[in-house]
C-alpha cells in the first residue's frame, strides 16, 4: 500500500495549539495542493480527535476531480477512515453524514451507535498502523492519505 502523510506545521514546528479553535496554518494555495493530493488517493484517514475538534466532512468538492474518479470506476468521495481509543464519536459528525463514501472506524471498543453509518473494526488490543493497513488492503484500498495530528502521525512513522 502507498501511504502519504499530509500535515502542515508552523515555522517553529507546531502542528496545532491547545486552543479549542482550529489553528489555521495553511494558505489557500496549500489547500489546493491538499485537494489535488486527496483526489489521487483511495482513502483518507483522520484521527478521532480531529473529528471531534474540527468536524471535517473529508470530501472532494472539486467537480472535475469527482468526475475523474467516477471515470476511473471509483466513488466520487474517498473512503473515510478514523481511529478511536475512547470510542467518543457521534454519528451526527460530518464524517458520517456527508458524502458518498465507505466509512471505517478502528476502535478498541464496540460502538453500536455507529451501526449503519460506518463499519467498525474492533481491535483486541491497541490500534496499530500495521493493523489498519492490513484491514484496508483487504477492503481494496491501495493509496491511503493520512491527514493526522501528532498522535496519528507518530503511529504511522513508528
What are the roles of these predicted feature ranges?
Residues 2-142, 151-154:
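Active-site ligand-binding patch in enzyme domains
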Residues 156-158:
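Short, intrinsically disordered, charge-balanced linker/junction segments flanking boundaries
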Amino acid at each position: 500500500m502507498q501511504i502519504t502523510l499530509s500535515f502542515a506545521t508552523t515555522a517553529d514546528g507546531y502542528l496545532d495549539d491547545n486552543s479549542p479553535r482550529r489553528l489555521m496554518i495553511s494558505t489557500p494555495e496549500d489547500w489546493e495542493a491538499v485537494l489535488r493530493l486527496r483526489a489521487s488517493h483511495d482513502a483518507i484517514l483522520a484521527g478521532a480527535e480531529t473529528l471531534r475538534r474540527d468536524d471535517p466532512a473529508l470530501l472532494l468538492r472539486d467537480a472535475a476531480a469527482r468526475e475523474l474518479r467516477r471515470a476511473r470506476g471509483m466513488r466520487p468521495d474517498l473512503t473515510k477512515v478514523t481511529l478511536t481509543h475512547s470510542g467518543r464519536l457521534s454519528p451526527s459528525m460530518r464524517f458520517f453524514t456527508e458524502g458518498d463514501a465507505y466509512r471505517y472506524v478502528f476502535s478498541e471498543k464496540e460502538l453500536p451507535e455507529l451501526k449503519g453509518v460506518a463499519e467498525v473494526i474492533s481491535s483486541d488490543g491497541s490500534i496499530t498502523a500495521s493493523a489498519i493497513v492490513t484491514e484496508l488492503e483487504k477492503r481494496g484500498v491501495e493509496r491511503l492519505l493520512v491527514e493526522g495530528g501528532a498522535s496519528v502521525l507518530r503511529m504511522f512513522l513508528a
